[in-house]
Amino acid sequence: MTVYATVDSPLGELVLTGEESATAAGGTALVSLSLPGQQGAAEARNGRRLAPGAFEEIAEQLRAYFSGELTCFSIEFAPGAGTDFQRRVWRAVEEIPYGRTASYGRIAERVGAAGAGVRAVGTAIGRNPLLVVRPCHRVIGADGALRGYAGGLPSKEWLLGLEGALAP
């Protein structure tokens, strides 16, 4: 069964959706985490059951992250989202350390799609359903400029500032 909950954050109310899982902490594997006003955000109430308790562990990790106490999430993601290429890109994004950034070109190189593949990498990153916890906010332009973010550039800038990843 698909469940959802909302969690207050410095970025506004986050919407978490998940699937029941026997192996995940709290019994729920995360399907999506959406920011307020996000392009392609999950519709929380359409056919989903409100279950705040199902996300207690995830909510606690988010609170610790937003207060600067957590630098690496330990969350089970529901399987099956994305194409093979998107999943390769998302795994590469997950490897970017807290407080660091990587360019779209660097991610393209890591997944074997250098050159023209940079645009495809950008598209795959734009389809990441797990904002914040799968840190696509850490991907920037080759020139160091902040580029697109489904949650909006102000949120991306705020997250990078929290992590100390913005150049002075």
Task: Show where each model-derived region lies.
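Feature detects long, helix-prone N-terminal segments enriched in hydrophobes
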Residues: 113-116
